[in-house]
């Protein structure tokens, strides 16, 4: 929340009472530090302003220290990598130019509408650099502002580009919060009264783009742990650095990997705000410490498995497990999906000569299913680990017994029947199949009684048993295909 104050020459207090104000605080701190502008942190002053909000830290500053000229200078410095004119000036700093450099300058001019409008009629030939330098310098602020506000990964991703460095707006400038004032606005307020709608827009929201992580990522993040200004700034700095140093496909995967290794700077419940260039709104992920600890426990698990479903979607097991962990969702559906992948590979055997590769993939899938079952049971907190271990052991024993009887085909048959029943949530059928198998091999399954008591709640026992039914004797299994 922004408050006007009268405090020893300072006239403004901004407190991180919501994520927008918190992100603005982080961006402003970077701005003030860049220009070495004096400001104070609320928690660090003994005498507080009269009308501050208790329970929140904040920054105390002079409103006139925020000017458009300084703001654009900061933009140019902070997002230098995306400032096309800076790249051009860097090239023009040379005394001589290669054909490649000449072509690059002309291509860079064409790449931005504002530069094309200023220099499009003049082609760089290596002898007229003075014209290019003077034109850029004379129109520097216009160039910076236009490139920044129209950049899909810059201001435009976060705010309505028409509202950059404006004040007293009727609605908030942020994407997802902004309303077109030229259209009917009665529907946005309570009881169709636009007067009841709180726009809550401040100039300081223009500093929000500086608070989010790595602009080279399609989806960027802001960690709203607003315990104090110091933790806000330091956490987001560390978070952004870790994202930059983390290898992995997909921004969401990077986020999850960074969260796994964030114990040095995230040790309590936090809110993470994300903004994707594909969306016209912000998203929120609330990370509870309890779930974060469980996520960190997964760091030693071998969960890497990807499978192409169609041109637009790849199933990523690691991502699926991590997101369910954070959102406190169980893995039942993921386990069933992995079983379906196993049978898809089985059907591919008929159409492929690479039988050994398919067997290798199937073995990997079953290993992953075993891990998923253990994780699932630990999340549920059910005391059935003894039965899970027993089910896996009996699955291996049954497989060996069937191979001894030269009944390898029965392994696949019973396994498929059990999984088909579980996928259909037909637990009576699953019980029948397991009882039939018990009678066929002449073994009493001690784990089975727990499954009989409550099949829905204890289906992980059946998952574990089915995943352990494998043709362990590869030579025999080859002969029985």
Residue ranges and their predicted role:
Residues 103-171:
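A broadly conserved sequence feature marking short terminus-proximal activation segments
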Residues 143-146, 173, 224, 231-232, ...:
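Generic hydrophobic/packing signal
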Residues 1-124, 134, 286-481:
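Long, contiguous all-alpha helical interaction modules
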Residues 146, 150-184, 189-203:
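Long amphipathic alpha-helical coiled-coil/heptad-repeat bundle
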């Amino acid at each position: 929340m922004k408050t006007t104050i009268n405090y020893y020459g300072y006239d403004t207090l901004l407190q991180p009472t919501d994520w927008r104000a918190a992100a603005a605080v982080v961006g402003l701190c970077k701005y003030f530090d860049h220009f070495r502008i004096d400001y104070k942190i609320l928690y660090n002053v003994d005498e507080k302003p009269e009308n501050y909000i208790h329970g929140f830290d904040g920054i105390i500053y002079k409103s006139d220290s925020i000017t458009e000229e300084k703001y654009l200078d900061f933009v140019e410095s902070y997002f230098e990598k995306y400032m096309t004119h800076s790249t051009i000036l860097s090239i023009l700093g040379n005394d001589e130019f290669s054909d490649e450099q000449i072509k690059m300058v002309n291509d860079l001019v064409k790449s931005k509408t504002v530069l094309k409008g200023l220099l499009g009629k003049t082609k760089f030939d290596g002898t007229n650099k003075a014209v290019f330098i003077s034109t850029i310098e004379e129109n520097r602020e216009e160039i910076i502002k236009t490139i920044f506000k129209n950049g899909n990964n810059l201001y435009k991703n976060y705010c309505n580009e028409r509202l950059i460095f404006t004040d007293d707006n009727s609605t908030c400038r942020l994407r997802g919060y902004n309303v077109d004032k030229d259209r009917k606005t009665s529907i946005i307020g309570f009881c169709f009264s636009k007067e009841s709608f709180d726009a809550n827009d401040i100039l300081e929201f223009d500093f929000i783009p500086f608070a989010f992580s790595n602009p080279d990522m399609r989806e960027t993040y802001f960690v709203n742990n607003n315990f104090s200004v110091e933790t806000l700034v330091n956490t987001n700095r560390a978070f952004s650095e870790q994202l930059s140093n983390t290898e992995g496909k997909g921004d969401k995967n990077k986020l999850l990997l960074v969260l796994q290794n964030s114990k040095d700077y995230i040790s309590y419940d936090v809110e993470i705000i994300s903004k994707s260039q594909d969306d016209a709104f912000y998203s929120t992920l609330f990370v509870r410490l309890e779930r974060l600890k469980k996520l960190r426990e997964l760091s030693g698990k071998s969960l890497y498995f990807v499978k192409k479903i169609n041109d637009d979607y790849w199933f990523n097991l690691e991502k699926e497990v991590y997101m369910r962990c954070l959102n406190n969702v169980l893995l039942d559906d993921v386990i069933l999906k992995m079983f379906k992948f196993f049978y898809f590979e089985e059907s591919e055997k008929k159409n492929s000569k690479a039988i050994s590769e398919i067997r290798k993939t199937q073995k990997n899938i079953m290993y992953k299913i075993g891990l998923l079952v253990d994780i699932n049971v630990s999340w549920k907190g059910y005391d059935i680990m003894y039965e899970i271990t027993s089910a896996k052991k009996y699955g291996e024993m049954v497989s060996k017994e069937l191979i001894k009887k030269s009944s390898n085909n029965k392994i696949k048959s019973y396994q498929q029947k059990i999984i088909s029943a579980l996928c259909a949530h037909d637990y009576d059928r699953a019980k029948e199949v397991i009882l039939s198998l018990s009678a066929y091999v002449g073994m009493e399954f001690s784990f089975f009684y727990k499954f009989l008591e409550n099949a829905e709640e204890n289906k992980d026992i059946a998952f574990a048993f089915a995943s352990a039914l494998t043709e362990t004797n590869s030579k025999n299994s080859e002969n029985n295909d």
